[in-house]
Amino acid sequence: MRVYEKVRAYIDDNGLKQVAVAQKAGIPKATFNAIMNGKRTLYADDLRAICLALNVSPELFI
């Protein structure tokens, strides 16, 4: 399972909305959607922002 798939599964499993996570992470909705669909690379800075928004460690997804 790829990192973005783990992030997406975590969001879904915890009943969160992707748009809410994107807003909290400071990532544009379209960019976040592209990352979660594997159409854009999930860079370390984006992963860090997402993890801060989710209040989890990046190691959870690696």
Residue ranges of predicted features:
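Short alpha-helical "recognition helix" segments of helix-turn-helix
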Residues: V21-A22, I50
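Short, basic-rich loop-to-helix N-cap that marks the start of a DNA-contacting helix
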Residues: K39-L52
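Helix-turn-helix DNA-binding elements, focusing on the entry/boundary residues of the two helices
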Residues: Q18, K29, A44-L47
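Key DNA-contact positions within bacterial/archaeal DNA-binding proteins
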Residues: V19, A30-N33, E59
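A short, Lys/Arg-rich alpha-helix, primarily the initiator
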Residues: M1-K17
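Recognition helix of helix-turn-helix/homeodomain-like DNA-binding domains
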Residues: I27-L42
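Short C-terminal boundary/hinge segments that cap the last helix of small helical domains
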Residues: N55-I62
